[in-house]
Curated annotation (Swiss-Prot):
Pfam annotation, one family: AceK_kinase
Catalytic activity: L-seryl-[isocitrate dehydrogenase] + ATP = O-phospho-L-seryl-[isocitrate dehydrogenase] + ADP + H(+)
Active-site residues, as the UniProt record annotates them: 380
Organism annotation: Xanthomonas campestris pv. campestris (strain ATCC 33913 / DSM 3586 / NCPPB 528 / LMG 568 / P 25)
Source lineage: Bacteria, Pseudomonadati, Pseudomonadota, Gammaproteobacteria, Lysobacterales
Functional note: Bifunctional enzyme which can phosphorylate or dephosphorylate isocitrate dehydrogenase (IDH) on a specific serine residue. This is a regulatory mechanism which enables bacteria to bypass the Krebs cycle via the glyoxylate shunt in response to the source of carbon. When bacteria are grown on glucose, IDH is fully active and unphosphorylated, but when grown on acetate or ethanol, the activity of IDH declines drastically concomitant with its phosphorylation.
Full protein name: Isocitrate dehydrogenase kinase/phosphatase
Amino acid sequence: MNQQPLPPQSERRALAIGRAVYEAFQDYHAQFSQITARARQRFETRDWSGAREDAVARIALYDHYISECMLRLRAVLLGQAHDRALWMRARTHYAELLTGLIDQELYKTFYNTLTRRYFRTQGVDAQIEFIALDIEPTDAITVPVARHTYAVSPGRLTEMLVRVLGDYPFEVPYAHRTRCAAAIAVRLLDDLAHWGEHPVRSVELLETVFYRERRAYLVGRLFGEHRFSPCVIALVNDDAGLRAEAVLTRRSDVAQLFSNSRSYFQADLTTVGDAVVFLRSLLTHKPIDELYTMLGRAKQGKTERYRTFFRHFQAHPAEQLVHADGTPGMVMVVFTLPSYPLVFKLIRDRFAYPKTMSRAQVEGKYELVFQLDRIGRLLDAQPYRFLRFPKARFSPALLQDLQSSCAMSLSEDGDDVLIALCYVQRRLRPLNLYLREQLPAAAHAAALDYGQAIKDMARNNIFPGDMLLKNFGITRHQRAVFYDYDELCLITECTFRDWPTPTSYEEQMAAEPWFHVGPRDVFPERFALFMGLPSSQLEAVKHMHPELFDPQWWRDLQARLREDDYPDTPPYADAQKLA
């Protein structure tokens, strides 16, 4: 696009803006790296509470540095903060600074965020933002990510794995490095026996160690004669010392490790885009936005999610946005494009009884989720502001519902609809529908995992509030995940009570409690009434997870959590652990 030259003073100002934004992103990136690098020490010293604090602090960095950059720019802009011609030239100068950078897309997203704050952009503004819906940004990345490569001679797999573990030293020694290597080798040979007599010919592992919760991961891939698979070695540092706990080679298992229902990894990567390219070779079906997000680059994940969705949206002009499958919510209106696996959630203007929270409280719940260890049970929900859709793309029923129920979030601009705030999540099959649709064995397994999901969340100080099946979904790996957060709270905030024994016939037959119930009172013995499970599945859940219905179990767990004693929740089944 040809730009009109600016007066010399304005040109210098545009150059200064570009330089200031560039330096602000570098400052952000340096602080991001500093926090991320602490993950190794947290792991070595078993400082799990410090690791949780770092995860929360790192998420807050982005908005902090955007705000700080706006303060820096006050002295440069001198009353020209909304001068479009100035920002157009600043974008040109900024782009020149990014030439040759692997992670220039991260820099561009930072710049876009800044301009949207200044201009309150509704939709996108191609004149002052970096917009490229028609490209896949990682396609231009050809520099290989830093990695270790190991050749494997027949019969010497254990020897090679001893060398691998030695190349990733920690301040705490391995409990028994050779024994760990031998256990990994046995599992690899067992998992890959169908590849032939000597299945592993070489191994590649990223130099950067990935950390999350209580584990460190060596992430890479292994090659046979004609094929390759992921290879992720999970390390733990517990009372037994530093040791290898598991090795994952199936793509489905690694995909669950990188699931967007988990918290972000702490991986101190020099550059991110080349790592995303590598990870995509392992997880070919994983959307690029989820990979950026799982590496802690949530804003870039949002950018890529927007880019890929709207590219698909424009390529299917006849398809309409419709209500998502499932029971309509009292707090949210949820819609989707049937051919694309996302849902868009808008807060209703008014909530039906018995919902009593405010709009601000609902937004606060969704913000809280970002600060929690989601342990594979809470679906990532990214907020988007001022999305623009053609009005004609909404089905009549959906448009009418949005106009009548979500007027505070909706406005019209000519032939377009603007959405002030919505939350975007991966689309899952609602659990209540899934249980009706599946054969008995699959439904039984899903019901049991639903119980396990509640237990996993509880052990990480998360209480879902509303346990109805419609608030849970099933992933493509048949895992139950919670995704409706308006009643979510912390276990440590609740009061878990026994249900009083009736003392009269009237109390026994009362439809409502005959005793005072506080706003945070929870009665686990009554959970079965609110789950909505068919009787056979409910009995199975009670048999497999009886503690869920025991008030004392919840009180004991609450006491542990208040002492910052969080039970460990491994991201894989016990059967996957090494002998």
